[in-house]
């Protein structure tokens, strides 16, 4: 496993995930009966400051259909958490107008690259174009100087 699991921290994430899903109207418990489901949800809500007990609640009451989705969410959150510790792995955000993002996404798709790789490639293309333009300008000046001397 690449990223260390931190039980207390991840239990808090699981609690937040389940509460968010409940507030969005999803069934987070395995119970069909509304009163049993509400009782289990109330128990979960009371565990906000008891991260160790959240895992027990999950084993006992959670809807089995949520298991894989929650695992994926926690795995992604763990990755972001550890990547945020280092400057070179931390995700950055930039504000783009929708049309710019749309064009960039289309270009990335056509090139078969990620958005980041496409941006780097565009920067390199612009730098190479600039170097080429400078070189051509220099050659033109040298040629004019040679022709002017004769």
From Swiss-Prot:
GO biological process: cell division; regulation of DNA-templated transcription
UniProt KW Nuclease keyword: no
Keywords: Cell cycle, Cell division, Cytoplasm, DNA-binding
Localization per Swiss-Prot or TrEMBL: Cytoplasm
Alphabetical list of Pfam families matching this protein: MatP (PF06303), MatP_C (PF17414)
One of the record's GO cellular component terms: cytoplasm
Keyword Nucleus assigned: no
Principal localisation: cytoplasm
GO MF annotation, one: sequence-specific DNA binding
S-S pairs: none
Cited function: Required for spatial organization of the terminus region of the chromosome (Ter macrodomain) during the cell cycle. Prevents early segregation of duplicated Ter macrodomains during cell division. Binds specifically to matS, which is a 13 bp signature motif repeated within the Ter macrodomain.
Entry-linked HAMAP family: MatP
Assembly mode: Homodimer.
Name of the protein in question: Macrodomain Ter protein
Record organism: Escherichia coli O6:K15:H31 (strain 536 / UPEC)
């Amino acid at each position: 496993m690449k990223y260390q699991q931190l039980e207390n921290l991840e239990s808090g994430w699981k609690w937040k995930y389940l509460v968010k899903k409940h507030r969005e109207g999803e069934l987070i418990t395995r119970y069909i009966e509304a009163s049993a489901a509400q009782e289990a949800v109330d128990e979960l809500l009371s565990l906000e400051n008891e991260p160790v007990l959240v895992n027990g609640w999950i084993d006992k009451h959670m809807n089995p259909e949520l298991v894989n989705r929650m695992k994926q969410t926690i795995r992604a959150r763990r990755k972001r958490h550890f990547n945020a510790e280092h400057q070179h792995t931390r995700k950055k955000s930039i504000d783009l107008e929708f049309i710019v993002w749309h064009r960039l996404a289309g270009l990335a798709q056509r090139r078969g690259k990620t958005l980041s790789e496409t941006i780097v490639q565009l920067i390199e293309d612009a730098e190479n174009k600039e170097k080429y333009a400078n070189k051509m300008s220099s050659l033109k000046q040298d040629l004019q100087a040679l022709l002017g001397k004769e």
